[in-house]
Amino acid sequence: MSKSIVFFSTVLVFLFSFSYATPGIATFYTSYTPCYRGTQEGVMIAAASDTLWDNGRVCGKMFTVKCSGPRNAVPHPCTGKSVKVKIVDHCPSGCASTLDLSREAFAQIANPVAGIINIDYFP
């Protein structure tokens, strides 16, 4: 009985956490210009668009990202998973997304063939 309550509570917390997420767009990239001048920050990383960049103040912040649907003709790109990424770069002006994820992070939440997806994200 107590395991059921813990499981149910965990599911509720997860569901409510995404109900407060911000919608956006994600793409992926492979060429990084790190905020940390060459310090490797792993593979679960992202570049922030001008919307989030805030003169670099977002560097080092963590965001949870989940695919919320397609943005092109690739059917059903979402895996149903979420990923936690660290902002380590700036997506330059004209960037087609809110968050430009590493290929590894993108592949956790969507089929890389899609290239661009709708997302929900929160800090």
Curated annotation (Swiss-Prot):
**Domain (Expansin-like EG45) ranges:** 24-123
InterPro entries under this entry? EGC1/2, Expansin/allergen_DPBB_dom, RlpA-like_DPBB, RlpA-like_sf
Question: What's one GO-annotated cellular component?
Answer: apoplast
Q: What SMART domains does its record include? A: DPBB_1 (SM00837)
Keywords per UniProt = Secreted, Signal
Q: Which residues form the signal peptide?
A: 1-21
Which named protein is this?
Answer: Putative EG45-like domain containing protein 1
GO biological processes: cellular response to hypoxia; systemic acquired resistance
CDD domains assigned to the protein according to its UniProt record, in alphabetical order: DPBB_EG45-like
Q: Does the keyword Heme apply?
A: no
Which parts of the chain are coiled coil? none
Q: What does this protein do?
A: Might have a systemic role in water and solute homeostasis.
